[in-house]
Amino acid sequence: MVRKTDVKVVEGLRGGNGTVELHHIVSKEELNGHGTMYAHVIIKPHSSIGLHQHVGNTEPYYIIKGRGVFVDNDGSRIDVGPGDCCIIEVGQSHAMENNTDEDLEMIALVYNE
């Protein structure tokens, strides 16, 4: 099977600011109960994904383009760029900010514990 990705544009994702595009690579159903999201995520300039907690799942972000600030579970703010992998473990909270004039692109996978 070959198909196009399902694209969703969200304003204020998880209480964040601005626009985030979610290009779902496979659907939740196609993950067969192993997870809820596998997507190419584009955080538009001066936008963010708000602070939220992962209950019952883990999420790695792999940055492929642009620069951003990862807000970790302990509140620390870490500059990230292409090639960086941010791992959010079960029970942890996090946020991601794009404070630049360019898109921040990453691959995100949310899988169940």
Region spans (language model):
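Conserved short histidine dyad/triad with adjacent acidic residue
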Residues: H24-S27, A39-V55, V90
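Short acidic-glycine-tyrosine-enriched beta hairpin
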Residues: G75-V90
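A short hydrophobic beta-strand segment most commonly corresponding to one strand
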Residues: H40-V41, P60, I87, D101-E113
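Short beta-strand His + acidic residue motifs that chelate non-heme Fe in jelly-roll/DSBH
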Residues: L51, F70-V71, I88, H94-D101
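Glycine- and acidic-residue-biased ligand/ion/polar-headgroup-sensing regions
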Residues: G56-G68
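A generic "binding-loop/recognition-motif" signal
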Residues: P45-S47, G56-N57, S76, Q92-S93, ...
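A short, N-terminal "cap"/entry segment at the start of jelly-roll beta-barrel domains
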Residues: M1-T36, G50
